[in-house]
Amino acid sequence: MSKRKLTQNQKRRIQSNNEKTLHRHQRREKKEIDWQDDMLGESQDGIVVTRYSVHADVEDAAGEIFRCNLRRTLSSLVVGDRVIWRKGNAQLQGVSGVIEAIKPRQNEIARPDYYDGLKVIAANIDRIIIVSSVLPTLSLNIIDRYLVICENAQIPAVIVVNKVDLLSDQERAEVEAQLRIYQQIGYQTLMISALSGENMEKLTALFDEGTSIFVGQSGVGKSSLINHILPEVNAQVGDISENSGLGQHTTTSSRLYHLRQGGQLIDSPGIREFGLWHLDQEQITRGYREFQYFLGTCKFRDCKHLNDPGCALREAMEQGKIHSVRFANYHRLIASLEETKSQRHFSSEN
């Protein structure tokens, strides 16, 4: 007799319960290695390069990394956070110090979590690099989802399409036409191949300064790109699932890497469903930068931008000022948002 498959909600509930149990256990362990004040040195600046459940790896001004405990007063800590920490006079169970405070963030990138609300992934980002792939097919809808996040966080975005060595001449022309949609509204795009090396120098040049973060679904080749940019890191590369074309998750924790040319790179775990249900319709609408000029000019204040009479957005689309693909993706995103919120409301009542 075959086992009954679990629903996605059941899987998320099981995962959440496991994580909470592990967190409680690690909290108990942490109490055993709390530092006394006279065991700690002077306060110093640092940056979080990796965050674990109750610990974090902090890099000091000299580039040395120390595993630290977190003060219980710290409500949130993520990769990229600039912190005040103190080094211990000795190591205790592999822990070398304590993080005492988080400096104000320049910005943050977050995704919704079904059980814990909004979960911040990284902080103090100068550039978000959206990595997509032509395998199994290039999804503009997924790209638009990431761009909505970027626009709401007010962080510049670069669209990178990987594995273009797999394209025929005709397919390449089609992808180039798709990317022109984004170039025309001011986004930088780049077609690359980690395998053949095409345009990898241009990709590497993006990291000359500032802190960048790779985002993208599993299987798009983020780990392969890191291996090319930082060969000494040797990030684990996952195999593509033969059934879905999506890769297995290969990065378990977000991590910040320093690049030889001076910038930093944050690699985050693959996200198959980058939910946007924490955003309302107005935030989604403002996540489409080419809509900005026309917002507030519709005939009716409560215009849904569908078939409403006097809709400035639809008129702009019909005149070619807004691309029809982006306009269709916008409505697809709004519809999926309403459906997801309805399902969450139903689930919370049962």
UniProtKB/Swiss-Prot annotation:
Family matches, as Gene3D superfamilies: Nucleic acid-binding proteins, P-loop containing nucleotide triphosphate hydrolases, Probable gtpase engc, domain 3
Cofactor annotation remark: Binds 1 zinc ion per subunit.
Subcellular location: Cytoplasm
Entry EC no(s): 3.6.1.-
Matching Pfam families: RsgA_GTPase
Database matches in InterPro entries: G_CP_dom, NA-bd_OB-fold, P-loop_NTPase, Ribosome_biogen_GTPase_RsgA, RsgA_GTPase_dom
Record carries keyword Endoplasmic reticulum: no
Listed name of the protein: Small ribosomal subunit biogenesis GTPase RsgA
Species for this entry: Pasteurella multocida (strain Pm70)
Lineage, opening ranks: Bacteria, Pseudomonadati, Pseudomonadota, Gammaproteobacteria, Pasteurellales
Gene that encodes it: rsgA
